[in-house]
């Protein structure tokens, strides 16, 4: 199965900004699905180093860990 996750949330809502990546790398990817992530609108700022390192939502891993796992597993991230 192939799934493309999308978020438009940025730093103003760190939990919502992290959910798509969390579902992609800790959900679908772990059960063997092909996944990709689209960052649009305010979410594009999440790839900046200082932003990436500071975003921590509630109940999800920090954004830097999610992006590292995505990179480790070659998950495409579209901006």
Task: List the model feature ranges, each with a label.
Residues 17-30, 37:
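Histidine-anchored nucleotide/phosphate-binding helix
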Residues 31-32, 74:
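Glycine-centered short loops/turns at secondary-structure junctions
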Residues 34-40, 77-79:
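Short internal beta-strands
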Residues 9-11, 41-45:
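Acidic, glycine-rich active-site loops and adjacent beta-strand->loop/helix elements
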Residues 4-18, 51:
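Short, glycine-rich nucleotide/cofactor-binding loops
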Residues 43-56:
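N-terminal beta-loop-helix "entrance" segment that forms/cooperates
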Residues 53-79:
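A glycine-rich helix N-cap at a beta->alpha junction
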């Amino acid at each position: 199965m192939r799934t493309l996750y999308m978020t438009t949330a940025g730093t103003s809502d760190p939990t919502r900004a992290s959910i798509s990546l969390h579902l992609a790398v800790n959900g679908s990817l772990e059960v063997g699905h092909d996944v990709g992530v689209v960052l649009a609108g305010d979410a594009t700022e999440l790839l900046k180093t200082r932003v990436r390192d500071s975003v921590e939502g509630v109940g999800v891993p920090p954004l830097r860990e999610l992006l590292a796992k995505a990179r480790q597993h070659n998950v495409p991230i579209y901006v």
